[in-house]
């Protein structure tokens, strides 16, 4: 049975997203830029792809949320990542770190660790990336995960010293973070579609959606749960109307657009899970 409180929180968040239409600054990779923008527009937000060193910091200070995605970094964008993260931190703009490929590629792994000093509001990655970022090993295969999302929970908890909330995505998404009362909670979001990893940029675009939800929710934990749930429900609906990856990609955008608070109430599967012994609240 779904956690009723969490479901209602997500239902309220999706209404807030459509009402406020937050503007996300996405410093993302060249593979995902177009699809990420379409995902944000379909869901109810908007996007600006500002990743040059001259404008990135100024824009981060006024955006609703910022995404820093390490998918295809170069010297210029790496500097813009740091500038944007520092500006967001200073201005109080929520920002998301998506540590794509961390663990398997040393240079970007160093960039990701450096970014942690600016305390991302949320970290979103697959299980291998979360484990690697926490310094606990991890088996990263390109941008794909070779670890189960449940196995990343200890690593995600350790990253709460650097971020307000952390998610490890997979067939089931595991999310940890502090609630409005300051207590650490674990939330599991089920659903989704096996076709998601067959379409490029679905994971990277989730990072953008997290940034959008952070702009309209009271805690980073709420924002992560809302974004993951929106994607889980929309992709499940999309699969019902698709015959393969191509038609799924189109159906997914349509479903992100049509999912509303009532859809969340009827289809979301959100559960609390017990944290390992010794977790301090």
Curated annotation (Swiss-Prot):
Pathway: Cofactor biosynthesis; thiamine diphosphate biosynthesis; 4-methyl-5-(2-phosphoethyl)-thiazole from 5-(2-hydroxyethyl)-4-methylthiazole: step 1/1. It is an enzyme of class 2 (transferase). The gene is thiM. GO terms for molecular function: ATP binding; hydroxyethylthiazole kinase activity; magnesium ion binding. Keywords: ATP-binding, Kinase, Magnesium, Metal-binding, Nucleotide-binding, Thiamine biosynthesis, Transferase. It comes from Rhodococcus erythropolis (strain PR4 / NBRC 100887). Its cofactor is Mg(2+). ATP binds at residues 124, 169. Its EC number is 2.7.1.50. Catalyzes the phosphorylation of the hydroxyl group of 4-methyl-5-beta-hydroxyethylthiazole (THZ). One of its GO terms (biological process) is thiamine diphosphate biosynthetic process. Belongs to the Thz kinase family. It catalyses: 5-(2-hydroxyethyl)-4-methylthiazole + ATP = 4-methyl-5-(2-phosphooxyethyl)-thiazole + ADP + H(+). This is Hydroxyethylthiazole kinase.
């Amino acid at each position: 049975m779904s956690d009723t409180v969490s479901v209602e929180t997500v239902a309220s968040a999706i209404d807030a997203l459509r009402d406020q239409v937050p503007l996300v600054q996405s410093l993302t990779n060249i593979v995902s830029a177009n699809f990420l923008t379409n995902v944000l527009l379909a869901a109810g937000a908007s996007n600006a792809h500002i990743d040059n060193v001259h404008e990135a910091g100024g824009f981060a200070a006024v955006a609703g949320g910022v995404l820093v995605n390490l998918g295809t970094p170069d010297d210029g964008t790496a500097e813009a990542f740091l500038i944007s993260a520092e500006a967001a931190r200073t201005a109080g703009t929520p920002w998301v770190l998506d540590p794509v490929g961390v663990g398997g590629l040393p240079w970007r792994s160093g960039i990701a660790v450096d970014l942690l000093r600016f305390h991302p509001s949320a970290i979103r990655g697959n299980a291998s990336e979360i484990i690697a970022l926490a310094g606990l090993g991890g088996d990263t295969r390109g941008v794909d995960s070779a670890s189960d999302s449940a196995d990343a929970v200890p690593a995600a908890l350790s990253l709460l010293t650097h971020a307000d909330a952390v998610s490890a995505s997979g067939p089931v998404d595991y999310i940890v973070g502090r609630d409005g009362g300051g207590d650490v909670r674990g939330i599991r979001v089920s659903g989704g579609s096996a076709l998601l990893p067959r379409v490029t940029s679905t994971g990277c675009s989730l990072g953008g959606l997290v940034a959008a939800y952070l702009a309209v929710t009271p805690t980073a934990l709420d924002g992560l749960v809302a974004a993951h749930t929106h994607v889980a429900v929309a992709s499940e609906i999309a699969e019902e109307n698709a015959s393969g990856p191509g038609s799924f990609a189109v159906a997914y955008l349509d479903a992100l657009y049509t999912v509303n608070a009532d859809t969340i109430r009827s289809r979301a599967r959100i559960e609390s899970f017990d944290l390992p012994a010794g977790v301090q609240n």
